[in-house]
Amino acid sequence: MKLTIHEVARAVDAKNDVTGYADSPLVKAEFDSRLIGPGDLFVPLKGARDGHDFIETAFENGAVVTLSEKEVEGHPYILVDDVLTAFQALAAYYLQKTGVDVFAVTGSNGKTTTKDMLAHLLSTSYKTYKTQGNYNNEIGLPYTVLHMPDDTEKLVLEMGQDHLGDIHLLSELAHPKTAIVTLVGEAHLAFFKDRSEIAKGKLQIADGMGKGALLLAPADPIVEDYLPADQKVVRFGPGAELKITDLIERKDSLTFKANFLEQALDLPVTGKYNATNAMIASY
């Protein structure tokens, strides 16, 4: 992580004067005090327990500075109104500083598989990093950004949603160059009025994208009302711009052709949905 204490303070609009602290380079940012090592920034988030209760432990483990919503005695700290908001602002700043190309993936199903396939394809030509595990929410995404290797060129971010507006926040933070919506299903329907509202939330992935950026979306009538006007939208599915033209399924593998691919692709997995995921990752 190529950041220093003073730089972090500026990025998060610190409420205190940090110029008296050494402008030490930081190794990484952690919100779990048990994972803190020498040279780290501690991010005391509030969850089941208040991370502020573990600030002392974080410094014992090697932290050189902490974000905090209150004054900290005896240790360097960066005072902010809200630690989570500051964490997100720091990640947004870091993406802008590094200039890494961001690829974002969401969907009710298939987003993790598609993320992994896309990252694999990009890694053949670029230094690529991707969301680890299920770190796809308002905490996990900034954590992913701040943990990418210093030489990263392409960053593939998975974006999840439990409530309407979740993906809007993530997109505005990450400003994707390319985004994919794999499928609009009924996952998390308990938190949404209906499938149409799920589609609305998923398509908010375009909210932070620049004019002319590429958005891949399913050829599903449910998404039509929410497609952006300023981005290049390419649909996939039967009868759409991108489609599978031939599919051979075997016991433990498959081969498929798509209308834009010059040759067939072989996959060591089964299921047409995996062929679709691979197709859109390959575009």
Predicted features and spans:
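Adenine nucleotide phosphate-binding catalytic loops in nucleotide-utilizing enzymes
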Residues: 195-196, 232-283
